[in-house]
Design a protein with these regions (language model features):
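Contiguous, amphipathic alpha-helical segments that mediate oligomerization or scaffolding
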Residues: 1-34
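Cysteine-centric segments in proteins
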Residues: 22, 73, 77-79
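Acidic, low-complexity, intrinsically disordered interaction modules
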Residues: 27-72
Length: 84
């Protein structure tokens, strides 16, 4: 994939996430330096199209990471002691 294709995909995913923020403001928050997606909403907002690369617990946080339409998506949540 060349540079222009990557930029195009990045613009597409940005538009997709902005649309999700408008439709589901309680689940998606975009600020200057980050995009936050509610943990339970991650799979619902990005079904089947997310190719999970990693799912792990580190320093009290559970992380999910994967690719969606050429963009790398990350979400995490604090793990309660009874879940660890």
């Amino acid at each position: 994939m060349n540079y222009h294709e990557l930029i195009s995909r990045a613009i597409d995913i940005q538009a997709h996430i902005r649309a999700l923020e408008e439709e589901f403001p309680e689940l998606v928050a975009i600020d200057t330096n980050s995009i936050q997606i509610e943990w339970d909403a991650f799979s619902a907002l990005f079904p089947n199209d997310v190719h999970m690369e990693k799912h792990f617990i580190h320093e009290g946080y559970e992380h999910k990471r994967g690719w969606y339409n050429g963009a790398y998506i990350v979400t995490c949540r604090e793990v309660k002691p009874d879940e660890a």
